[in-house]
């Protein structure tokens, strides 16, 4: 059963993967924790967007283990797309926008792992991706 919105669930899963696979990157774990708080308290995405780009950015983290690496990259893409578009499209709720970003990433033809994309999207929408990270 869904407990949090999709964006929060995606951020929590990013944090969980990082805590599990690279606990030595406490600065990025803390960064994601702030992103979660910023979103839940103020519906703010600016801090999260600052994580991308430049030397030593979120995009420069080492590989995660197994499918965590693919899931981590998938979630980063979805969260970045959402953060970039949030507040720029009038008349669309954050939840609907996140669903669109998730659908776009899931359906992207250039991704070689269509079944995994669909499984990630399904569990993210259901709010149980965190519990299923090691099953994917």
What kind of region is each of these model predictions?
Residues 1-35, 99-136:
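Short terminal alpha-helical segments
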Residues 51-54, 64, 85, 89, ...:
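Intrinsically disordered, low-complexity segments enriched in small/polar residues
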Residues 3, 21-28, 41, 47, ...:
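Residue-level recognition of alpha-helical structural elements
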Residues 76-108:
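C-terminal tail/extension regions appended to the core domain(s) of diverse proteins
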Residues 58, 65-69, 84-88, 95, ...:
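Short, cationic, amphipathic peptide segments
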Residues 41-77:
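Short, charged early-sequence alpha-helical segments and their helix-coil boundaries
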């Amino acid at each position: 059963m869904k407990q949090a919105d999709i964006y929060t669930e995606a951020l929590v899963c990013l944090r969980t993967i990082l805590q599990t696979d690279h606990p030595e990157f406490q600065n990025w774990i803390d960064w994601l924790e702030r992103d979660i708080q910023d979103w839940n308290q103020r519906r703010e995405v600016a801090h999260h967007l600052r994580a991308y780009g430049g030397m030593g950015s979120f995009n420069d983290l080492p590989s995660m283990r197994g499918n965590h690496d693919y899931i981590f990259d998938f979630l980063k893409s979805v969260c970045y797309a959402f953060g970039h578009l949030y507040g720029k499209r009038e008349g669309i709720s954050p939840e609907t926008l996140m669903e669109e970003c998730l659908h776009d990433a899931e359906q992207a033809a250039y991704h070689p792992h269509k079944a995994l994309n669909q499984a990630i999207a399904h569990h993210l929408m259901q709010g149980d991706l965190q519990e299923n990270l090691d099953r994917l």
